[in-house]
UniProtKB/Swiss-Prot annotation:
Descriptive protein name: Carbamate kinase
pH dependence: Optimum pH is 7.0.
GO biological process: arginine deiminase pathway
A molecular-function term among this protein's GO annotations: ATP binding
Function of the protein: Kinase that plays an important role in arginine catabolism. Catalyzes the phosphorylation of ADP by carbamoyl phosphate. Shows weak activity with acetylphosphate.
ATP-binding keyword on record: yes
Primary gene name: arcC
Keyword Zinc included in the entry's annotation: no
UniProt cross-references to InterPro entries, sorted A to Z: AceGlu_kinase-like_sf, Asp/Glu/Uridylate_kinase, Carb_kinase
Record comment: activity regulation: Inhibited by ATP.
Organism: Pseudomonas aeruginosa (strain ATCC 15692 / DSM 22644 / CIP 104116 / JCM 14847 / LMG 12228 / 1C / PRS 101 / PAO1)
Amino acid sequence: MRIVVALGGNALLRRGEPMTADNQRENVRIAAEQIAKVAPGNELVIAHGNGPQVGLLALQGAAYDKVSPYPLDVLGAETEGMIGYMIEQEMGNLLPFEVPFATILTQVEVDGKDPAFQNPTKPIGPVYSREEAERLAAEKGWSIAPDGDKFRRVVPSPRPKRIFEIRPVKWLLEKGTIVICAGGGGIPTMYDEAGKKLSGVEAVIDKDLCSSLLAQELVADILIIATDVDAAYVDWGKPTQKAIAQAHPDELERLGFAAGSMGPKVQAAIEFARATGKDAVIGSLADIVAITEGKAGTRVSTRKAGIEYR
């Protein structure tokens, strides 16, 4: 079975946790313990978020004023290497030594006319109090938005159109390699058709939407969107909340989910299920084996109408 696992940012750094290398490695180790359970006998691709990490690099760059800050596409590439290295090493420590791994720097095409460039929505970096956020917005010209009871910097998040490195990813999978790619939604890139040239863009692509595109282009058998809850819920946080066990994309789309949290995950699952006729599942990383067996998570499928709740 060809599996694409999209790791949420919380799998790499928990909310409010200091962004140290040791903390990130420990979280990667915990995630690797779960993902390694589904590696034997399957073709495995791992995508991951990078919001906290790319924000931290931006802050570190801004602190050294003798060099102009690096653009977001370059910072995204840096995080792909850093996080991919940690995942490779921690997964490799759990699986037989001869199992090959590869991290692919992944350029992802976006449209320069995407309206997202005029409406920044993607949170990056650490969380701030209202006072801190307002001060930083004034000092640095950032766009700031609420994130729960805190605030974060937000940047443009255009839709992914095409993954340029999809052929090398396929070649590696066919040779039995576990591939880490499309980290942080990939490196946002524009393609000049006339000049046949690529150029980076100041943006961060949504990891879940890019993972959905990746799974579609790889013709994956299942897309697993791993998060810190066991399913997608209706009425989340209310006494009436209910976990969704299974849903047809059309029915799920009518419910509406928060744009900054579950919304992109649900949309990514819907797009994959519609495009391929295969299942996408939103659930907890701790349940990954049960998810592959159809026993856990919210399964988005075109094969059955309606919605079922737990």
